[in-house]
Amino acid sequence: MAAGQNGHEEWVGSAYLFLESAVDKVILSEAYTDPKKKVAIYKALQTALSESGDSSDVLQILKIHCSDPQLIVQLRFCGRVLCGRFLQAYREGALRTALQRCMAPALAQEALRLQLELRAGAEQLDSWLTDEERCLNYILAQKPDRLRDEELAELEDELCKLTCDCTGQGGAIQVASAGSKFPVSSPTEEKPLPAACQTFLFHGQLVVNRPLTLQDQQTFARSVGLKWRRVGRSLQRNCRALRDPALDSLAYEYERDGLYEQAFQLLRRFMQAEGRRATLQRLVEALEENELTSLAEDLLGQAEPDGGLA
């Protein structure tokens, strides 16, 4: 098999991810068949899965099946190392956490608990998660048996229609069903900068994702105060440049300059290390995790004088 630019074409496998809500009143299969919720659920799945694999160009949803009360997501993996990264996220619970966080607003829930199961063919991989090599071999043995489902392309077209007229640097789009496209490029394509139809959910609204700017740094540094360290700890989970002892070093180096400069330099280091991956979505999620919703609203330009959302 011919290798792609990054060698991903040499390793292709498939698996099924089963999702079931542990909340009695939430039936995922029913929710996904609701046209008002389908787009938001699809976006939530795409976002969480892309986070877990740390790359959207090697993990692709081929089809979403409804099997009451479950959703069954057929996945295509391209690249052994990144498939291993997905397995690690699944094993350590990071995927479950991401799915619960992303799907809760899509289902109009404040919180959501999910039960997951991972299968490759007849093998239930949950029984072998500590043996990553075995899991990888099972996934590799299951070659994708289909092309990407046409319905998923239609969902992404719908998402683009919702967001294609958003050319500003930020802002939210209020829609009945919130969700967005997370495009999956081929392994040989360079990962593009966030486009207008790459969005994320914030309090049930679609927000256009984009790289962070100098203005974002200033807004963050002006308002975050003592919590800049806590936000840094949230960001450091997926940013090696912020891992210990980086935060302590920043605090010491800029102690005389005050909290504003410490917070400003935190985002500066994040943006330098991550480049175009230092996005508004990642910062907003870190702020929400640390109960700094009002600051997130300021960054999104959604804050009203009375503190509400635009």
Curated annotation (Swiss-Prot):
Domain Death: 213-303
Domain of life: Eukaryota
Posttranslational mods: (Microbial infection) Glycosylated at Arg-243 by S.typhimurium protein Ssek1: arginine GlcNAcylation prevents homotypic/heterotypic death domain interactions and assembly of the oligomeric TNFRSF1A/TNFR1 complex, thereby disrupting TNF signaling.
Coiled coil segments of this chain: none
Main location: nucleus
Signal peptide: none
Keyword vocabulary terms for this entry: Apoptosis, Cytoplasm, Cytoskeleton, Glycoprotein, Nucleus
Disruption phenotype: Mice develop tumors. In a C57BL/6 genetic background, mice exhibit a shorter lifespan than wild-type, but exhibit low incidences of observable tumor formation. In the FVB/N background, which is more tumor-prone, mice show a significant increase in the spontaneous development of a broad range of tumor types.
Glycan-modified residues: R243
Subcellular location: Nucleus; Cytoplasm; Cytoplasm, Cytoskeleton
A Gene Ontology molecular function term of the record: identical protein binding
Motif (Nuclear localization signal): 229-242
SS bond partners: none
GO biological process: canonical NF-kappaB signal transduction; extrinsic apoptotic signaling pathway; extrinsic apoptotic signaling pathway via death domain receptors; positive regulation of canonical NF-kappaB signal transduction; positive regulation of cell migration; positive regulation of execution phase of apoptosis; positive regulation of hair follicle development; positive regulation of inflammatory response
CC terms in the record's Gene Ontology section: cytoplasm; cytoskeleton; nucleus; plasma membrane; tumor necrosis factor receptor superfamily complex
Cross-referenced InterPro entries: DEATH-like_dom_sf (IPR011029), Death_dom (IPR000488), TRADD (IPR035712), TRADD_N (IPR009095), TRADD_N_sf (IPR036729)
Spans annotated as Interaction with KRT14 and KRT18: 220-287
Placement of sequence motif Nuclear export signal: 147-163
Function summary: Adapter molecule for TNFRSF1A/TNFR1 that specifically associates with the cytoplasmic domain of activated TNFRSF1A/TNFR1 mediating its interaction with FADD. Overexpression of TRADD leads to two major TNF-induced responses, apoptosis and activation of NF-kappa-B. The nuclear form acts as a tumor suppressor by preventing ubiquitination and degradation of isoform p19ARF/ARF of CDKN2A by TRIP12: acts by interacting with TRIP12, leading to disrupt interaction between TRIP12 and isoform p19ARF/ARF of CDKN2A.
PANTHER family (UniProt xref): TUMOR NECROSIS FACTOR RECEPTOR TYPE 1-ASSOCIATED DEATH DOMAIN PROTEIN
Complex formation: Stimulation of TNF-alpha receptor TNFRSF1A leads to the formation of two distinct signaling complexes. Plasma membrane-bound complex I is composed of TNFRSF1A, TRADD, RIPK1, TRAF2 and BIRC2/c-IAP1 or BIRC3 which interacts with CHUCK/IKK-alpha, IKBKB/IKK-beta and IKBKG/IKK-gamma promoting cell survival. Subsequently, TRADD, RIPK1 and TRAF2 dissociate from TNFRSF1A and form cytoplasmic complex II with FADD and caspase CASP8 promoting cell apoptosis. Within complex I, interacts with TNFRSF1A/TNFR1, TRAF2 and kinase RIPK1.
Domain notes from UniProt: Requires the intact death domain to associate with TNFRSF1A/TNFR1.
Protein name per the record: Tumor necrosis factor receptor type 1-associated DEATH domain protein
Organism: Mus musculus (Mouse)
